[in-house]
């Protein structure tokens, strides 16, 4: 495969932010909703989506007495401090470095997060970003017409790297993001899913002659030989 670039999702792929989002959303639900706890039945439709979709799903599911925009603003207030200490997922600190310096790939990030939230959650890893990441595309970029599961963000990230998606490997954890990566035309998609979504990902229908889908338990299992 003629792979020249690697594109990484952020939440749940590079950084372990999903529990932070859950806690912040739960605080808003407790304050303005019906007191229910977030369940996987709802959360599975939220993982990997844009913040706008994410918030609308929660508002509708838990009868929140706020608009989606108000929910987002309140939730984001609860995210600021925890983001400052969020950790890398297993193998996620090393893999982009390896892609850039050992495999000689251009490396990008494509995240559904807004620029504001991206900067908050990466404030403590600025040097790592500078060293390992060539381009970053956030979910509120005006050039993105549709969020995941539409492929727009990955197509744009590849373009920012000066590449076509078919020359990229894309790393994702969420079903919506994996579908977006496949739809972009990427030659290879590396999925590191929540175990609860693994079955759904294994059952994705796609053109196996166009895209190779690799499913791993954690990113430290990745090696370029898996693509070839």
Predicted regions and their residues:
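Non-catalytic, surface-exposed connector residues within folded enzymatic/regulatory domains
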Residues: 37, 69, 86, 112, ...
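N-terminal helical cap/lid subdomain that shapes the substrate entry/recognition surface
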Residues: 2-103, 119
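Conserved phosphate-coupling serine/threonine residues in phosphotransfer and NTP-handling enzymes
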Residues: 13, 111-113
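Asp-based, Mg2+/Mn2+-dependent phosphohydrolase catalytic module
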Residues: 1-4, 114-228
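Proline-centered flexible-loop/turn and helix-kink motifs
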Residues: 103-104, 127
